[in-house]
Amino acid sequence: MAHLGPTPPPHSLNYKSEDRLSEQDWPAYFKVPCCGVDTSQIESEEAEVDVRERETQRDREPKRARDLTLRDSCTDNSMQFGTRTTTAEPGFMGTWQNADTNLLFRMSQQAIRCTLVNCTCECFQPGKINLRTCDQCKHGWVAHALDKLSTQHLYHPTQVEIVQSNVVFDISSLMLYGTQAVPVRLKILLDRLFSVLKQEEVLHILHGLGWTLRDYVRGYILQDAAGKVLDRWAIMSREEEIITLQQFLRFGETKSIVELMAIQEKEGQAVAVPSSKTDSDIRTFIESNNRTRSPSLLAHLENSNPSSIHHFENIPNSLAFLLPFQYINPVSAPLLGLPPNGLLLEQPGLRLREPSLSTQNEYNESSESEVSPTPYKNDQTPNRNALTSITNVEPKTEPACVSPIQNSAPVSDLTKTEHPKSSFRIHRMRRMGSASRKGRVFCNACGKTFYDKGTLKIHYNAVHLKIKHRCTIEGCNMVFSSLRSRNRHSANPNPRLHMPMLRNNRDKDLIRATSGAATPVIASTKSNLALTSPGRPPMGFTTPPLDPVLQNPLPSQLVFSGLKTVQPVPPFYRSLLTPGEMVSPPTSLPTSPIIPTSGTIEQHPPPPSEPVVPAVMMATHEPSADLAPKKKPRKSSMPVKIEKEIIDTADEFDDEDDDPNDGGAVVNDMSHDNHCHSQEEMSPGMSVKDFSKHNRTRCISRTEIRRADSMTSEDQEPERDYENESESSEPKLGEESMEGDEHIHSEVSEKVLMNSERPDENHSEPSHQDVIKVKEEFTDPTYDMFYMSQYGLYNGGGASMAALHESFTSSLNYGSPQKFSPEGDLCSSPDPKICYVCKKSFKSSYSVKLHYRNVHLKEMHVCTVAGCNAAFPSRRSRDRHSANINLHRKLLTKELDDMGLDSSQPSLSKDLRDEFLVKIYGAQHPMGLDVREDASSPAGTEDSHLNGYGRGMAEDYMVLDLSTTSSLQSSSSIHSSRESDAGSDEGILLDDIDGASDSGESAHKAEAPALPGSLGAEVSGSLMFSSLSGSNGGIMCNICHKMYSNKGTLRVHYKTVHLREMHKCKVPGCNMMFSSVRSRNRHSQNPNLHKNIPFTSVD
């Protein structure tokens, strides 16, 4: 694209102007001598040819004008070049002479190609009706013009260009060519560029694009070429406006304005529609606050010397007031950020008026600063720096109240001069040495003088920009003096650095200054504007936020630089993303997802007495803060955003199931005695607990158990989810997550000891006795099926799963037991959200848990392992201590030996001891596994070990198995015999995470309860697996020895990590997988487990 004019500026494109010579007469223009020919004769002949050509062009003018008038008569016609008479305007530079010299023809000769993707248009051809549409490809003018525009500012955002007339012409054509109106934002920016050009250049650009100066100042064309008043105007589209806005980032004069427009675009989306009575309210507000331009200012402007007025103001009929304020007076950049009434212009040559000291502290005086600007001279080059200064400036005191205009416009620290002390200091400096400082510039913020404007700019950036850079993390109000410090802070993944409530005292002054002063901080704001220029990098303000899983973390976040500076900032077209959207989560095993918490949760600060443990940080439900779990490892490059969407059924299931995913001891008393009136649930992991008839006559107080349950299982519910989230990605946390089955066995042993030592005690025990240490958590056997399956709640099952779960639990009596108050009364509601200690009611169960944590924390939590008297202020610390096998190994083995000597439990001691030894020593103690895997043991002995309960448990649980057979095949792998021996006896059906066996196997177990060999080793294997699986405690992988929270997670681990090391059942049609060869062989050799399979032959 080009600049048009008789004297093209240097470095312009090779476009022909109307007064430039043709190719035939360039030798005459340059007076090139020819050998043997009289040069004077040649010059005279060429001059005659030139005159004749000009006469011919003059004759063609009327005909061309008639053609253009006929073309304008079309209904859909848009503005084109030379459609109106402009000779009456000052500075008229001539019109186009013929079609051969038309601007579009010259542009077509330069091959302005279309930049859209997959468009093969090689040259823009203006449409016959709409000039901005190409006749060849039907694409717009902007898409073609981008081929000639520079895009270096997108890749080098720190560099700015000098405003040149040919570049301004190119950018002006994007919005003025073929249009009849200019968007307001683009006109503001173009006005700013025009203000640094000469008058002749501005007029030449406008006339070259078919606009008059009057129409441009008005913002739209009033009449067409035929004199008809227009009532409809052609204007560029919004997408083209956004692309054009990017071009103004090339210049220091408009860069900061474009950045402010991006901020206002985000803020303007939430502006409400004004009411009908706004006009009167606005008039009242303006008159009462008197914030408009003072009459003296207007008088000064109207009566000022024309020689000192900018050329852009010299417009007939006083159209200068249609321009923005800065064009009326060519003030420098630092003062452009002030409100319109912040300056009082004086006539050139007048001295600075020095107010007396007595009037400086009076707030009823005028709040305008008095400025004596340097007169503008046409022979001077306008200052193009983003930060300039003005000499002879003396701010007066500002009123105590800050106007809304000041709050909304980001300005520099000049408002700090509202204090009388600052004004007095400037006044004193001005009085002391005004004569000696002639030619120097001084800082408007602190009053110091400097040798030149460059030094002032360096000083201003280094000293007075300390509150210009706010942290880009949404909700963090930290401010910094440099972009480097701000970016380093913003990139820190520690969420506590961005929490307002944990702010250090050293930051309060900056924050108070930021919020109290009239100088807002330029913060990074996410805009919804998005437009990708075809064939180019993204050109919109921002691109839509990408999927957090697919988005890689950016090296630094985008921030808008200071208004008056050119700071190193990242590319402006980059998207503004929150830290949560930029996080790239580490690849980890699938675990139970986080159940979002409700937005109405009461927020209680954690008590100071609670020790710092890897606990979960409760998400503060402020709209500006998204906090990450405190336990998340620092390997995560950015904090993880916890989504706040509410799953309606989450609370319902949490309340109904009493968090079955929690680890801990579940007291299931299978006694049919009338002393116990609560419903109990049956779970495969709890079959060891009912081990003798001696214990069946014992009842533990339901009051204390319910109280312990309400204070433990519900409180740990949110913490378990976060543990599941992080345990697979951080193996070293496995020891901390071993909170499941150790509780079961330790508390069972504790219960056995208490019952054996006190055989004659009453059935109900007082609330102050040690029974409070026994906490009750109910493991619903339908939990895995309804929550962890591929159709479960966590995977999108939703309400249908909720209804199905409710029907199952109601029909099979697996629902949550009834709640009891401390007095033993049955509560009316299944889950009354009340505190069982102080009887207070809350809105949600989560509020109850917070209440327990903050109010009833004085009740210490004793270790659940019998014989260990360690007490902790938090359940999390107690559970972590209780789950540590190394701390209780000697204690547990000693108690087991004592229990083995008890003659009242002959059939229990060996079985229970083996169970504990398996758990305590794991794969390092194969004796327990050998006892378990003794396939030749008689079924009667096995059944006597189980006391008849294990079989019923397995039958009832297997009835609920809804698994389907899988066609997955896995290759067997050979590994050490020790790993094979240490494998789990329980099979894993690969396509059903939650089922323990396939449908045929479970059906057979359900319908053959009396077969002596039908359960045998399989039931013992199920017990062994459940002894490792608790409800949410440590389940050890027998291959890699990692700990997992539940059986579902372990099965997924087997499927994703150890699939090649699993061993498939040899019976055709049976898809059971085993982690050891011995377990697989014992399963494959049991014909009773494969009756319903079509092919029952064993390989």
UniProtKB/Swiss-Prot annotation:
Glycyl lysine isopeptide (Lys-Gly) (interchain with G-Cter in SUMO2) cross-link site: K277, K396, K416, K421, K641, K894, K919
Compositional bias of kind Polar residues: 375-385
Phosphoserine, modified sites: S561
Tissue specificity statement from the Swiss-Prot or TrEMBL entry: Highly expressed in testis, uterus and small intestine, and weakly expressed in colon and prostate. Also expressed in skin, primary keratinocytes, immortalized keratinocytes, and HeLa and HEK293 cells. Not detected in blood, thymus, spleen or Hep-G2 cells.
Biased composition (Basic and acidic residues): 49-66, 670-680, 719-742
Domain of life where this protein originates: Eukaryota
GO molecular function, one term: rDNA binding
Residue ranges with Acidic residues bias: 648-661, 982-995
PROSITE patterns with a match to the protein in the record: ZINC_FINGER_C2H2_1, ZINC_FINGER_C2H2_2
Record localization: Nucleus
Protein name: Zinc finger protein basonuclin-2
Annotated region (Disordered), positions in chain: 45-66, 357-385, 397-423, 622-641, 648-742, 929-948, 968-1008, 1079-1099
Assigned keywords, A-Z: Disease variant, Isopeptide bond, Metal-binding, Nucleus, Phosphoprotein, Repeat, Transcription, Transcription regulation, Ubl conjugation, Zinc, Zinc-finger
Compositionally biased residues, Low complexity: 361-372
The keyword Nucleus belongs to this UniProt entry's keyword annotation: yes
Zn-finger (C2H2-type) residues: 441-464, 833-856, 1035-1058, 1063-1090
UniProt record, GO biological process: endochondral bone growth; mesenchyme development; regulation of DNA-templated transcription; roof of mouth development; tongue development
Its job: Probable transcription factor specific for skin keratinocytes. May play a role in the differentiation of spermatozoa and oocytes. May also play an important role in early urinary-tract development.
Source organism: Homo sapiens
UniProt KW Repeat keyword: yes
